[in-house]
Amino acid sequence: MVIRVFIASSSGFVAIKKKQQDVVRFLEANKIEFEEVDITMSEEQRQWMYKNVPPEKKPTQGNPLPPQIFNGDRYCGDYDSFFESKESNTVFSFLGLKPRLASKAEP
């Protein structure tokens, strides 16, 4: 399965852009394979994202905002959940990936 990060490339909200960049930079820095899915370029992908965010994670009004993170078809969470997992050092578990062990250089 590949990690899919649903983003909006043409979002007018600075906060959304910063959150999207934070997720992407973290994944790149940790060499985690992922795919960016731009919901502003595909109505089909936008509707898929809206449909597959669990009801308890949907806002009371409107639609879920990017970034939304999936591992294949399995919902991982939104930015707030990602940030919490980053702070608690549980991102691999959050993403449904096996943790990587840091390797130490031999003296």
Swiss-Prot record:
Q: Does the keyword Nucleus apply?
A: yes
Report the locations given in the UniProt record.
Nucleus
The record's keywords, sorted A to Z, are: Nucleus, SH3-binding
Identify the tissues in which this protein is expressed: Highly expressed in brain, placenta, liver and kidney. Expressed in retina.
| UniProt motif (SH3-binding) ranges | 61-67
* Gene Ontology, cellular component aspect: cytoplasm; nuclear membrane; nucleoplasm
Q: Which Pfam families match?
A: SH3BGR (PF04908)
Q: Which Gene3D superfamilies match?
A: Glutaredoxin
- Kindly list the GO molecular function terms attached to this UniProt entry: SH3 domain binding
- Where it mainly occurs, coarsely classed, is nucleus
Entry's family note: Belongs to the SH3BGR family.
What protein name does the entry list?
A: SH3 domain-binding glutamic acid-rich-like protein 2
Organism per entry:
Homo sapiens
